[in-house]
From Swiss-Prot:
Belongs to the ATP25 family. GO terms for biological process: mitochondrial gene expression; mRNA stabilization. GO terms for cellular component: mitochondrial inner membrane. Keywords: Membrane, Mitochondrion, Mitochondrion inner membrane, Transit peptide. The keyword Transit peptide applies. It comes from Lachancea thermotolerans (strain ATCC 56472 / CBS 6340 / NRRL Y-8284) (Yeast). Probable mitochondrial mRNA stabilization factor. It comes from the Eukaryota. This is ATPase synthesis protein 25, mitochondrial.
Amino acid sequence: MIERLILFNFQSDKNTKHTRVRNMLLRRAAAALPARKTPLHCYRRLGGSYRALSGSLLLRDEEKRLPHRVQDERDEAKADTDLAADGDSAATKPWYLNIVERPAQNMPLHQQEIVFPANSPKSLETIATFLRDKLGLSDVLIFDLRDSQDEQVTAASKISDFMVMATAKSGRHGHKSFIELNTLLKQEFKTVGQVEGNISANELRRRQKRLARHTNLSKSMGSRTATTRSGSNLESWYMIDCRLDNIFVNILTENKRQDLNLEELYAPPDQKHLYRREAPAEDVAPKEGDDNVLAGLKRLAARNQRRYFTTVPARVQIIDALSRQDFDLVLNVVSASKMDSLDILKAANQTLRSMPYGVKIEGESWITFLDEVWPLAPYSQDFWSTRLELFKLLNCAAPGQVNVDRVFTGYLKFKLASGESLTKSDLVEFLQLVETNLSENSHVDYEDLVAKNKCVLEALKLYKGLDPRLILDSEVMCLLLSTLSITQSGSTSTLRAFYEMVEFASREFSQEPPVPVTATVLRILADKQDYARILRFWEKSIASSPEKDHRPWPLFLDTVASTGDQEFAKKVIRDGHLLWIKRNGVKASPELREAIERLFAVADPAEVAFKDVKEFLTVE
């Protein structure tokens, strides 16, 4: 029995030292058991003879066992030495401290590389590395919201500089992660973060009970939210304000991150398409050969799926589609959204202004789109100003498709046909557009000048029954005079209507012509080098009373001097045109003296021929 017990205790031990101890114990047990056997009851009566016999027998047994005993003593001494050595090593280092270092597992989690923004603080690197290496969060992304160029400004870009996104394996993992992150902030940076989305178990049960009391509300909200035993949601989202360098951390479960798609919201405008999700394909009707039961299950599963939605505003989608001139997509977005027509028109104007140089503009398609989104009854002037601006942009980007005639038809005639009254600003904007087309186009010729003036004449006819005196406005008259002439290769060409307008202006403003009208006439005649008409126009406006000569003399003298023609300047002096300054008592202002100096510098650079006249005019 003892031998079995010894073998049972040492059966799984492979240590050599322990094997010696086991063998020694077995030999001792085998030697001790025969010696301890009790003699029979019959031999006890023999007395001394028995003791002598037993002594002799024991002596013989001892002689036989003497070699074995010596070997046992040697084994015992060696076993004691081994046990003492084991005891010393165990005393210095306990067995539970012998921990084997496991090699680091080569998992994809440790291979993920985090891209940090330029000039990011050291704290951001510490937090992002802690999320990846210590907490085991995956798909760590960092968005730089400093100097965001996104047209759709969000609250996150106003209060944060860096937005960190990370994925947790479960709701409990996310719950534990934000606790560990808060601990890091306390220990390393001496700050305490603020978390949103951490709903306790009691609060969650309270909400579920509230929903259960209202049956209809509970049905509309769907099934109860799945929670773990610790009270954390299976699908959760924790947003932590680190209160450190404007860093915000979002910890989401995988399904929650896919549903919210926050990357599209925080990404720069040129990277939003990388995170944009496509709309799910529409269900295909089952064929006749399909199993109706399976088809019904498919439809039921599709109906119970979460509805697709996007975080991109409709305005941003419209601008993106218009920049690619995908008008079908724009109309689909417009029909699906509830944007106001005015906002859509402003988005179109903004897109045209930001179009890169060299992109071919489809002018007719833009006008068709404008007519599609135009409201039936515009109630404010903003609609018409936005429409006019759109036509002006199209004329600038595609003058071959949207010319002056197209603008006249699409805006002036369209507005009048819609029951709206034309205003002075409408005519001024149209005349400025015509003048720009004539002055900035280097390939315009006399025929183009005639064609554009026919369009101007049609525009004036629209105002004939509205405000006939509008043509006498100085701003309108200056623009009309500018549209009647063109300058090509240093030479100016004018229509006959220009001289008729000059005669009309001289007749209507015989007493005090407006200064802008006078300046426009003098400029065009000087460019044309029609000096005789310059003097004729200037003399027609001489007042009969000396006290009423309010003509812009500095302007007239500067016009003569700017021609650089010495003979023309001498003619003005010799013919006595400057003497009207003294005759009519025109005040010699500093501007007038400077104009006289410039004129005499052109006519008499040596100051010999007209020195007396110059002194007479400049002396008060």
